Amino acid sequence: MGTCRESEPTQIFVPGPIIVGAGPSGLAVAACLSNRGVPSVILERTDCLASLWQKRTYDRLKLHLPKHFCELPLMPFPKNFPKYPSKQLFISYVESYAARFNIKPVFNQTVEKAEFDDASGLWNVKTQDGVYTSTWLVVATGENAEPVFPNIPGLKKFTGPVVHTSAYKSGSAFANRKVLVVGCGNSGMEVSLDLCRYNALPHMVVRNSVHVLPRDFFGLSTFGIAMTLLKWFPLKLVDKFLLLLANSTLGNTDLLGLRRPKTGPIELKNVTGKTPVLDVGAISLIRSGQIKVTQAVKEITRNGAKFLNGKEIEFDSIILATGYKSNVPDWLKENSFFTKEGMPKTPFPNGWKGEKGLYTVGFTRRGLSGTAYDAVKIAEDITDQWMKFNGPLSCRNICSSHIIHLHFNKS
């Protein structure tokens, strides 16, 4: 008797690039390619666009920078949007962006492995449903693909709720509770501020030095002021000006337990990727005592935490505002372009292109403006190659979501 053999995974040939990730970065590349007539396919592990924004951000979140610094290529924000759009408005902008350029990602496709095949000269991207194959691979999973959970001694002993900010929505779930907030970046500051709205008692852990700047100065964006000054003055001089501005509006934050780094805010961002905190009200609550600043945690106990200064405090809940990391090393089988942490080895502005048709977007540590820059560069480069392979007519005859399915069965 004959036996039925298991069929090979479905082979899906993509005439244009495969883009992994349907966040703003992946959509920006797809839009720029579509505008040039080059097809692409986006593989997205979740069931929606911009899943970080839709599923892993808190309700009160707004863009930290003015909207004109956060626009995706080819489509500005609506004029009636406020200077700092809310999370909900940004999501609506992203959805409108995808609709305008007819971008239709393949959802619920978790990339298990992507590797280059030297024999065929193609990238093979394996998901649970098949293997996508293309000449080009664009990594658009970004710097914030996975939450970072710190290794704090005793954390598993704690009997109360422990929540990463990726799962935090609002302070309503922590009303009237004493909460330990681990982390003092923009998320840690904003979560602490939000907790105060619900009469919670946040204690924010500050382990390292941190730059805090006012978000605005006399109605002008601090970031906008910095970008304008950098066109005319050296970086170190602009950093000195920003610190003078911060001290004049926020006071000496060292006195609040927020030590400033010796390196200036912009230089530190460029070198390490550490973003300065843009204050939206937390500093005044720290000064009034509504938000407590604490030293680094020595260990977590069943009911609270012991600190390096010897103090021990009981807490009802712990919120981990400890950021995110790249997940590229988990699935991309390539070790010459990315570091072991999953970041491009080549710094901005040249970190968008690797070898053998590999590209990366959303890893600039320069927010959405860096994403837009990379997306345009990638689309230009791929279009040049596409034209050589296919000619100008092909660019207009294939829609952006076109893919060819090839089924191979064992004999």
From Swiss-Prot:
Q: Which GO terms describe its cellular component?
A: cytosol; endoplasmic reticulum; endoplasmic reticulum membrane; Golgi apparatus; Golgi membrane; nucleoplasm
Example GO biological process term? response to ethylene
EC numbers on record: 1.14.13.168
Q: Which GO terms describe its molecular function?
A: indole-3-pyruvate monooxygenase activity; indolepyruvate decarboxylase activity
Q: Where does NADP(+) bind?
A: 183-188
Q: What happens when the gene is disrupted?
A: No visible phenotype, due to the redundancy with the other members of the YUCCA family.
Function, as annotated, reads:
Involved in auxin biosynthesis. Both isoforms are catalitically active. Involved during embryogenesis and seedling development. Required for the formation of floral organs and vascular tissues. Belongs to the set of redundant YUCCA genes probably responsible for auxin biosynthesis in shoots.
Write the protein's name.
Answer: Probable indole-3-pyruvate monooxygenase YUCCA4
Q: Source species, please?
A: Arabidopsis thaliana
